[in-house]
């Protein structure tokens, strides 16, 4: 499985503190080793329907999953109180 970051997510990632970046990097490595990326995520609803979120500490990764390409694209990374705004 491949995990990619959208430009916005890359910028958000680089703004995070180093320990949080390492937490997210460790999660991405685990995610790449999974057969089913939906097993640890949660489907989003309403205006974010069709996207998935992953919880990494107090941060959330909003992603799109493309089954035919076996690709997870990270669209947005933010603190849990800000991620859905």
Regions from the language model: what does each represent?
Residues 22, 39, 54, 81-82:
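Positively charged, low-complexity intrinsically disordered regions
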Residues 27-30, 80:
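Conserved short hydrophobic interaction patches
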Residues 29-53:
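A short, surface-exposed loop/turn module that caps and links secondary-structure elements
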Residues 2-11, 15, 56-59, 64-85:
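Enriched for short, Lys/Arg-rich terminal
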Residues 20-23, 34:
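N-terminal non-globular leader segments, chiefly Sec-dependent signal peptides
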Residues 13, 17-20, 52:
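Flexible interhelical turns and helix-capping residues at alpha-helix boundaries
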